[in-house]
Amino acid sequence: MNSVGEACTDMKREYDQCFNRWFAEKFLKGDGSGDPCTDLFKRYQQCVQKAIKEKEIPIEGLEFMGHGKEKPENSS
């Protein structure tokens, strides 16, 4: 599946491959220490957020995506 932004598609594929490899080879075998894909994910996330803003896609709550903040209780 392609990403929301064409410029992000290669980053998405790279992250997906990294995560799937880590999940299958480490996490499922009991090694949950660390995630080697964190930097890839952060770069991909920034790319997606930029694409969403450039395309003016209205997404409520985008400002807190990935910043460790919980969704406000009054949001649905």
UniProtKB/Swiss-Prot annotation:
Principal place of residence: mitochondrion
Reactions listed under catalytic activity: a 1,2-diacyl-sn-glycero-3-phosphate(in) = a 1,2-diacyl-sn-glycero-3-phosphate(out)
A Pfam family hit: UPF0203
Family stated for the protein in its record: Belongs to the TRIAP1/MDM35 family.
Species name: Mus musculus
Keywords in alphabetical order: Acetylation, Apoptosis, Coiled coil, Disulfide bond, Lipid transport, Mitochondrion, Transport
Positions of the CHCH domain: 5-55
Coiled coil residues, start to end: 1-52
Record-level GO BP terms: apoptotic process; cellular response to UV; DNA damage response, signal transduction by p53 class mediator; mitotic G1 DNA damage checkpoint signaling; negative regulation of apoptotic process; negative regulation of intrinsic apoptotic signaling pathway in response to DNA damage by p53 class mediator; negative regulation of release of cytochrome c from mitochondria; phospholipid transport
InterPro entries documented for this protein: MDM35_apoptosis (IPR007918)
Gene: Triap1
Its biological purpose: Involved in the modulation of the mitochondrial apoptotic pathway by ensuring the accumulation of cardiolipin (CL) in mitochondrial membranes. In vitro, the TRIAP1:PRELID1 complex mediates the transfer of phosphatidic acid (PA) between liposomes and probably functions as a PA transporter across the mitochondrion intermembrane space to provide PA for CL synthesis in the inner membrane.
PANTHER family from the UniProt entry: TP53-REGULATED INHIBITOR OF APOPTOSIS 1 (PTHR46403:SF1)
Presence of the UniProt keyword Phosphoprotein in the record: no
Phylogenetic lineage: Eukaryota, Metazoa, Chordata, Craniata, Vertebrata
Modified residues (N-acetylmethionine): M1
Protein name: TP53-regulated inhibitor of apoptosis 1
